């Protein structure tokens, strides 16, 4: 549920092989940062945004959370019934806006006002990927393609490649 707060799960330990100090931020549910090309950290250096199935532990429904890195406290920011699609989320460098895809819809979440609004809806059988904000935060670019069930090593767009 939006606004639900979760207590810190942080723990610190030393890696046996390297001797490096490790800080584990979460220890329940499935949690992950945005896609590896997207920055999950806020410019303030105190906050990280992440996706989690927290509250839906028996499913793969992921919603947006933020964590205070000092205290470890987490707050749920969205409650999408079908969840946010992995790899289909981005934010502005200052973390004011976060855009994400759920059910072929693009939502815009304002981290300052907590307003969450639908800004684009598409029909079924379309793929929306690679969201990106313009530098002035006035535009969101994204890929929109017909879903033709093309696979990385097969399908109609990969004629001549080895089939599965």
Where are these regions (language model features)?
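Beta-strand-rich domains and repeat architectures in extracellular enzymes and scaffolds
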Residues: 2-10, 17-62
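Multi-bladed beta-propeller domains
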Residues: 11-33, 67-84, 111-127
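Short, flexible, glycine/charge-rich loop motifs used to bind or transfer phosphoryl groups or to couple energy/partner
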Residues: 12-13, 38, 55, 79, ...
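Acidic/polar residues at beta-strand termini and the immediately following turn/coil
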Residues: 15, 42, 56, 68, ...
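Ligand-binding pocket scaffold of soluble enzyme catalytic domains
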Residues: 39-40, 46, 59, 74, ...
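Low-complexity, flexible helical/coil segments
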Residues: 50, 58-64, 85-86, 139-142
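Beta-propeller blade signature
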Residues: 64-70, 161-164
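Asp-box/WD-like beta-propeller blade repeats and closely related beta-sheet repeat scaffolds
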Residues: 79-164
